[in-house]
Amino acid sequence: IVLTASQPFTTALIASNMREFKYCWIWDKVRGVGFQIAKFRPMMRTEDVVVFGNGNGALATYNPQMVERDKIKKSKCYSSSDSSPLAYNDGLEREYTHKYPTNVIEVSNASQKGKVHPTQKPVALMEYLIRTYTNEGDVVLDNCMGSGTTGVACVNTGRKFIGIEREPRYFDIACRRIEDAQRQARLIA
């Protein structure tokens, strides 16, 4: 279960189920929001992405989205048969071109063409989270689908999607956006 939130709701959300809370990501929106109240408080540039899961974390799907290194790291490999970390196998050098992600996801909210919902997220953010926590062909549920961004991201990443939205206006918008994404996917395929 992956939910987005901001304080103080983040704290209440985590406290609601401490047993299944795993960790938080920080979504860096690159550009601050809330300019209307900037005279009274800092503009908000980040939002929390709260991850929950039941049972053993080792059983949950986690596909880390590796980040390309600016500079290739070269390192000598340790011998698997030698217990000393100082003993190198001569000539075995490995190049590391990627690194594991940190808990900060930088996805700009500035380039959201046609934003139609007040809490609409960028498709790229949802694609990142979907690739991280699901495999192709999995089913993703969005019980507050708003304008359908998660559904669009599911189409783009080869996942199935179930969306729930109580506002008929937003439900219609979501259906149109998802159908458009499906048409685009068929054109590319």
Regions found by a protein language model. Give the residues of each.
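Core catalytic lobe of class I
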Residues: I1-I173
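S-adenosyl-L-methionine
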Residues: E179-A189
